[in-house]
């Protein structure tokens, strides 16, 4: 994105209250206290059985360039809220913390840490907004694309959403996330250049309208392109569009590669059957039928149930905007902080809403898989010093309905949170996009089919270790007692 500032940075891509909190921490001398934050979401998107984690590469690029520029400082100075000494601190700011994260393409689930940030209180606070912005959007789009891939089977899926995305960055990074999730190619040329994603495209209705005739338009296109997919619904699909596509394909013969036709309107199930019939009768049995027009996984599922003869799916608006759930709701919570004695103490947020009660302490997520077939038994959230990978058997129980439990034997425990930055240094080698996509496919394969259902999937187990569970209950009791005592004292003081 171009800027009027030559030294523009993403450092101010944050909420004002992050800067305000940094100022408070700085003025009260706690800004260098060690802290640990964890990012997670509370509910799986689209009522899906899993989510696909995406956005790590952009987080890495963001952290690598995290500096307040001269114009950043000048702008903050102009707000009139911040003393020069604090601005001098910001001017010399560098991220020296550590980040652990799920890798891109990883299957992730509700209420488990996706990203863990450990560093000074100030630096952990500063990056919250951008981190959530990135993870919320890209994970959402990757998951939506995975749902589309799940119902489309082996059919090619093309990402066509650029013009409907919420601006340039959303289109570019949304395309990348969609490719991770399951799309085979994109219409976005810049995304193809930036990420090496295969590009694909046909032509618009404007081409046909410009020549005022299907035949003339298709002929002109065939004269300038070898690979041809003709858009046949500008005027009349069955009377003009397809017949003229067939006519041009026959006239040009081997001079072009007649890939097929695209339908962008009408009853897709009915029309695709009629179009297939016309193409087959003309001898073009290998020509494909492409479909677009506000498609998503639900539409594709219904069209397949109706026997639609569609071979290639072009998915636009409803994918790139996550149309039916445009927000993931990932949050970023403080789980541990250094006390006045230099000791890390656990902290948590409690609420009358059970789903908003956070889990205290630095944690690791372990993926538990059966050695017999590699299938996932569930995820196991444990405190950082616990090592379930060294146990012969593992007791797993539901964190709310504790009577739902099982003992797992002959298993492998794999840590989900991997080191990305260590004391400000990048220690993770970013994989190629094709490697991320292949990794995602492997993880999907390890998931039971019951968790992959588009409608009403079985709930994947995300369990707490006994130690984590006990510590959470103890922390809740301790905080409530502390609040009670302070409330009593406050009431006495107010009564004076």
Set out the residue ranges of the language-model regions.
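Gly/Ser/Thr/Ala-enriched C-terminal appendages of enzymes
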Residues: 2-33, 47-48, 295-496
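Buried, small/hydrophobic-residue-enriched core segments of structured protein domains
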Residues: 2-34, 43-45, 81-82, 87-96, ...
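N-terminal, Lys/Arg-enriched amphipathic/low-complexity engagement segments
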Residues: 35-91
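A residue-level signal for beta-strand positions that form part of recognition/binding surfaces
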Residues: 36-38, 96, 157, 331, ...
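Short amphipathic alpha-helical segments
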Residues: 55-58, 140, 432-436
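Short coil/turn segments at secondary-structure boundaries
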Residues: 74-75, 143-147, 161, 452-459
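Hydrophobic residues within beta-strands of alpha/beta enzymes
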Residues: 200, 261, 289, 311-313
């Amino acid at each position: 994105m171009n800027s009027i500032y030559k030294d523009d940075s993403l450092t101010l891509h944050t909420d004002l209250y992050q800067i305000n909190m940094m100022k408070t921490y700085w003025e009260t001398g706690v800004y260098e206290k060690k802290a640990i934050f964890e990012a997670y979401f509370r509910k799986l998107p689209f009522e899906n059985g899993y989510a696909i984690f995406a956005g790590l590469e952009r987080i890495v690029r963001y952290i690598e360039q995290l500096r307040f520029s001269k114009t950043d400082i000048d702008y903050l100075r102009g707000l009139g809220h911040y003393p020069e000494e604090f601005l001098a601190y910001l001017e010399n700011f560098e991220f020296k913390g550590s980040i652990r994260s799920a890798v891109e393409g990883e299957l992730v689930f509700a209420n488990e840490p996706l990203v863990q940030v450990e560093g000074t209180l100030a630096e952990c606070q500063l990056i919250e907004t951008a981190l959530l912005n990135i993870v919320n959007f890209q994970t959402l789009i990757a998951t939506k694309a995975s749902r589309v891939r799940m119902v489309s089977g082996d059919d090619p899926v093309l990402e066509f959403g650029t013009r409907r995305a919420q601006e340039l960055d959303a289109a570019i990074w949304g395309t990348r996330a969609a490719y991770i999730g399951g799309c085979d190619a994109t219409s976005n040329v810049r995304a193809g250049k930036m990420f090496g994603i295969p590009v694909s495209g046909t032509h618009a209705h404007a081409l046909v309208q410009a020549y005022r005739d299907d035949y003339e338009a298709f002929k002109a296109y065939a004269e300038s392109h070898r690979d041809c997919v003709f858009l046949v619904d500008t005027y009349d699909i069955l009377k003009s569009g397809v017949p003229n596509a067939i006519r041009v394909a026959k006239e040009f013969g081997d001079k072009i590669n007649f890939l097929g036709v695209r339908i962008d309107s009408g009853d897709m199930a009915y029309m695709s059957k009629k179009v297939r019939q016309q193409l087959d009768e003309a001898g073009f049995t290998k020509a494909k039928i492409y479909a677009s027009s506000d498609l998503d996984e639900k539409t594709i599922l219904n069209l397949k149930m109706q026997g639609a003869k569609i071979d290639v799916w072009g998915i636009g608006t409803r994918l790139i905007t996550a149309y039916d759930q445009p927000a993931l709701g990932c949050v970023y919570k403080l789980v541990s902080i250094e006390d006045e004695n230099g000791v890390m103490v656990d902290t948590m947020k409690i609420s009358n809403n059970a789903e908003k009660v956070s889990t205290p302490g630095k944690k690791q997520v372990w993926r538990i898989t059966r050695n017999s077939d590699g299938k996932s038994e569930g995820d196991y959230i444990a405190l950082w010093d616990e090592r379930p990978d060294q146990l012969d058997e593992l007791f797993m129980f539901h964190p709310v309905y504790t009577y739902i439990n099982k003992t797992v034997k002959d298993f492998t425990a794999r840590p989900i949170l991997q080191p990305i930055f260590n004391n400000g240094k990048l220690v993770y080698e970013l994989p190629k996009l094709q490697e991320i996509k292949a990794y995602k496919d492997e993880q999907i394969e390890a998931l039971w089919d019951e968790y992959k259902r588009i409608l009403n999937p079985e709930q994947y187990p995300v369990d707490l270790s006994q130690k984590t569970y006990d510590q959470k209950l103890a922390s809740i009791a301790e905080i409530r007692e502390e609040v009670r005592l302070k409330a009593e004292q406050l009431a006495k003081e107010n009564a004076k």
